[in-house]
Curated annotation (Swiss-Prot):
GO molecular function: structural molecule activity
Organism: Burkholderia mallei (strain ATCC 23344)
Disulfide pairings: none
Record key words, sorted: Bacterial flagellum, Periplasm, Signal
Family as reported in the entry's similarity comment: Belongs to the FlgI family.
PANTHER family linked to this entry: FLAGELLAR P-RING PERIPLASMIC PROTEIN FLGI, FLAGELLAR P-RING PROTEIN
Signal peptide start and end residues: 1-33
Protein name: Flagellar P-ring protein
Lineage: Bacteria, Pseudomonadati, Pseudomonadota, Betaproteobacteria, Burkholderiales
Length: 389
């Protein structure tokens, strides 16, 4: 009897092991822990856009056609006037035409200069700038940006930009033919602007009361962050104001505040799973869905509709000695064709792989799938939010 009992015990152990493996296989995967700096940001710690208008000179005959872009000529005249160089407003014959208007320059171009002022930037720090053509310049390659003030939204000058441009494209033209690789009307100057004014430190003005803003609104993630912060720094350190904003009580001293923020940003939190969502790009026909999308059983019938318009010229020749004229007319033929669309069963999908397999079984194009997904959503078969961008 002992061998029989041992065999039964081994069989029971094997069944228990198999049950555990099946439970692990079908159990939902645990959310991966992420650093807090990847989930949220401190309110007030952000970049500030800067913009300016200037001139690029030194172009090899590829600048603005100044007769067609009067603002380029006007800007050049103002710049020369600031340098103490005056341009005669009358012609040599005493006519009324302006010398500024008659200037035909090919080596200068009007440009817009943009930059991003990082948080806590100090005077003397160098930042990168992007230079983009404003007129009809063919290329900015080899040009030099003249001194350009960069202003913020408040109208104050925060940086000064100047330097030689780096353009990633290349091109050549001759006898009406032209070859171009990449973009020639924009370039970049690494470290081309010097910060002249700093933005007031918003964090220092909060007196130790900071607000943490989640990148994506989620009440569950906000609650998990509050629990993680309070467990690490003590109860009452973090309080959730809503699904996106968390209020923090930080040290008022700047040195202690830096240590607090460094430790805070490295906390690991497991965020809640994102809501099921399908993104439809109406311009490119792209469809993107996350792993939470599921399908219910449904039947789909979709037939392609095609319209063909064929236009051919028809020559009407008059009879002999009729004093008529030969006339060319256009004759159009329109054909409307619709393919037969039979009902196809779309099986339910509990995960992303099954959803993709079910949609691929329809054999529809991305443009057709956009209409099918919208119809599935209306019928209640698609368990996800549709967003068209």
């Amino acid at each position: 009897m002992r061998p029989l009992v041992a065999a039964r015990r081994r069989a029971a152990a094997c069944c228990a092991l198999a049950a555990c493996m099946l439970a692990l296989a079908f159990a939902p995967a645990a959310a991966r822990a992420e650093r807090l700096k990847d989930l949220a940001q401190i309110q007030g710690v952000r970049d500030n856009p800067l913009i300016g208008y200037g001139l690029v000179v030194g172009l090899d005959g590829t600048g603005d056609q100044t007769m067609q872009t009067p603002f380029t000529t006007q800007t050049l005249a103002n710049m020369l006037a600031n340098l103490g160089i005056s341009i005669n407003n009358g012609s040599a014959n005493g006519g009324g035409s302006s010398a500024m208007t008659n200037m035909q320059l090919k080596n200068v171009a009007a440009v817009m200069v943009t930059a991003t002022l990082p948080p806590f930037a100090r005077p003397g720090e160098a930042i990168d700038v992007t230079v983009s053509s404003l007129g009809n310049a063919k290329s900015l390659r080899g040009g030099t940006l003249l001194l350009t003030p960069l202003k913020g939204a408040d109208g104050q000058v925060y940086a000064l930009a100047q330097g030689n441009m780096a353009v990633g494209g290349a091109g050549a033209s001759a006898n009406g033919s032209r070859v171009q690789v990449n973009q020639l009307a924009a370039g970049r100057i690494a470290g081309g602007a010097i910060v002249e004014r700093s933005v007031p430190n918003a964090v220092a003005q909060m007196n130790g009361v900071l607000q943490l803003q989640l990148n994506d609104m989620d009440y569950g993630t906000a609650q998990r962050i509050v629990s993680a912060v309070n467990s690490s720094f003590g109860a009452g350190t973090a309080t959730a104001l809503d699904g996106r904003t968390i209020q923090l009580t930080a040290p008022a001293d700047s040195a202690q505040q830096v240590a607090f923020m460094a430790r805070l940003q490295n906390l690991e939190v497991s965020p809640e799973r994102a809501a099921a969502k399908v993104i439809l790009n109406a311009r490119t026909g792209s469809i993107v869905m996350n792993q939470m999308v599921t399908l219910q059983n449904c039947a789909v019938a979709h037939g392609n509709l095609s319209v063909v318009v064929n236009t051919q010229p028809v020559v009407s020749q008059p009879g002999p000695f009729s004093n008529g004229q030969t006339v060319v007319a256009q004759q159009s033929q329109i054909q409307l064709k619709q393919d037969n669309g039979s009902l196809r069963m779309v099986t339910a999908g509990a995960n992303l792989a099954e959803v993709v397999k079910a949609l691929n079984s329809l054999g529809a194009t991305p443009a057709d799938l956009m209409s099918i997904l919208q119809a599935m959503k209306a019928a209640g078969a698609l368990r996800a939010d549709l967003e068209i961008i």
